[in-house]
């Protein structure tokens, strides 16, 4: 039978054969294996019904994958041997390949993943630990695209260009790997979920990969998976206004705006999408978002992200303009010291200037924090490590090409 999700299901009761035709069938089944990692509970329920099993198996599998971080079906003790045999032939549980992992002395962790077939493309994820009033907080910054099409002038990811959207398995796989890194040496029965917060602030614009991102966040919120609070899952956007309204209709998560400028001329320069959706439209969309459905818990305020660029957007008048812009929008402001990257056209604002900027906002009644710089020793700024890895890869390929050319010259001369 062929399911709606394109799964070829073999008859496990049929007698096995060593014929060439049977081998061909097995190869076709392997090609059609579906990855369960990125499937929602509803999709898993449909999957199990399509292979002739009960829907409750979906919850069992989700817990094994996302709460105990088990990918080997043989370790799933409440799944029968017969069902495991069937599943092994039609599905897999596969996270993105980790090509680099770096753990900073300050607790920050960073992974570079290869996604796609063959040599694939590179994306990265950063985990930032912190202490708060609830105890130890671990915030994971997740990527949604390979590269980014928005080309914000201060962002290293945008300089790499846009390649493609990530799939749900590639998005949720980042969360899976981060959690699994804390429990890989822990007995299965004692494993817990380490990541407490997720921010969709990594490589790419999440709202331009809308369906896979919303799908992945729904898995984060599912009690059979990560069971995260709506207030602890945040989507950050540079300002794709129509999709902010669509997000409000589909999912209740916290919203962050990558603002970075308090007026349209400057934001046009720093965040080019502002030319299409200027500040007036963006702020109005943010106001609609937090008032949707009676101001639910995840939507009491919007987080405003503001990177501090020396001599560009950090003057006293910029702080005053920001106060005026946000006066009717319940918001928390996060000032971000700029992380320079190779050939960056900007520098980081001085500590004194950042503190003065913060004081103006705080005096106006805003909650305003300064993001602590972490992971400097592992290039934890978004896009930096992927850029370095890609650069090393290009240099290695160029060197191999030169060696091959020299060898060809030597052979021709000999």
From Swiss-Prot:
InterPro entries per UniProt: Aldolase_TIM, Methyltransferase_A, RlmN_N, RNA_MTrfase_RlmN, rRNA_lsu_MTrfase_RlmN/Cfr, rSAM
Cofactor(s) required for function per UniProt: [4Fe-4S] cluster
Cofactor binding summary note: Binds 1 [4Fe-4S] cluster. The cluster is coordinated with 3 cysteines and an exchangeable S-adenosyl-L-methionine.
Residues at which S-adenosyl-L-methionine binds: 204-205, 236, 258-260, 339
Gene Ontology biological process terms, A to Z: rRNA base methylation; tRNA methylation
Disulfide feature: 141-382
Domain Radical SAM core: 134-377
Residues binding [4Fe-4S] cluster: 148, 152, 155
SUPFAM superfamilies for this protein: Radical SAM enzymes (SSF102114)
Major location category of this protein: cytoplasm
Bias type Polar residues, positions: 1-13
Gene Ontology terms: cellular component: cytoplasm
Protein origin, superkingdom: Bacteria
Homology family: Belongs to the radical SAM superfamily. RlmN family.
PANTHER family cross-referenced by the UniProt entry: 23S RRNA METHYLTRANSFERASE, RADICAL SAM CORE DOMAIN-CONTAINING PROTEIN
Protein name (Swiss-Prot/TrEMBL): Dual-specificity RNA methyltransferase RlmN
Name of the coding gene: rlmN
């Amino acid at each position: 039978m062929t399911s709606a999700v394109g799964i070829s299901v073999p008859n496990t009761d049929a007698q096995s054969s060593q014929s060439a035709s049977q081998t061909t069938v097995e190869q076709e089944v392997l090609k059609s294996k579906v990855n369960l990692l990125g499937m929602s509970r509803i999709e898993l329920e449909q999957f199990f019904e399509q292979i002739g099993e009960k829907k409750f198996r979906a919850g069992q599998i989700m817990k094994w994958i996302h709460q105990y971080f088990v990918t080997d079906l043989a370790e799933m003790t409440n799944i029968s041997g017969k069902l495991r045999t069937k599943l092994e032939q039609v599905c897999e549980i596969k996270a993105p390949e980790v090509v680099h992992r770096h753990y900073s002395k300050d607790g920050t962790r960073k992974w570079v993943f290869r996604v796609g077939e063959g040599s694939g493309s590179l994306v990265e994820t950063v985990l930032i630990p912190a202490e708060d009033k609830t105890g130890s907080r671990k915030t994971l910054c997740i990527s949604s695209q390979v590269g980014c099409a928005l080309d914000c002038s201060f962002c290293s990811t945008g300089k790499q260009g846009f390649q493609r959207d990530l799939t749900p398995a590639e998005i949720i796989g980042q969360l899976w790997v981060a959690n699994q890194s804390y429990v890989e040496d822990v007995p299965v029965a004692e494993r817990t979920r380490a990541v407490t917060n997720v921010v969709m602030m990594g490589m790419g614009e999440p709202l331009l990969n809308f369906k896979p991102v919303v799908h992945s966040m729904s898995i984060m919120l599912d009690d059979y998976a990560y069971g995260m609070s709506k207030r602890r899952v945040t989507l950050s956007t540079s300002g794709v206004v129509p999709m902010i309204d669509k997000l409000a209709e589909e999912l209740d998560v916290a919203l962050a705006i990558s603002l970075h400028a308090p007026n349209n001329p400057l934001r046009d320069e720093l965040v080019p999408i502002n030319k299409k959706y200027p500040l007036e439209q963006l702020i109005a969309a943010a106001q609609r978002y937090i008032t949707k459905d009676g101001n639910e818990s995840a939507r009491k305020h919007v987080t405003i992200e503001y990177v501090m660029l020396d001599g560009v957007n950090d003057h006293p008048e910029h702080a005053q303009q920001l106060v005026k812009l946000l006066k009717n929008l319940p918001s928390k402001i996060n000032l971000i010291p700029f992380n320079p990257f190779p050939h960056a056209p900007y520098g980081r604002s001085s500590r004194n200037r950042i503190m003065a900027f913060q004081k103006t906002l705080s005096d106006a009644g805003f909650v305003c924090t300064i993001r602590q710089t972490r992971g400097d020793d592992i290039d934890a700024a978004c896009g930096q490590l992927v850029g370095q890895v890609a650069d090393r890869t290009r240099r290695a390929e160029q060197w191999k090409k030169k060696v091959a050319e020299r060898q060809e010259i030597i052979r021709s001369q000999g």
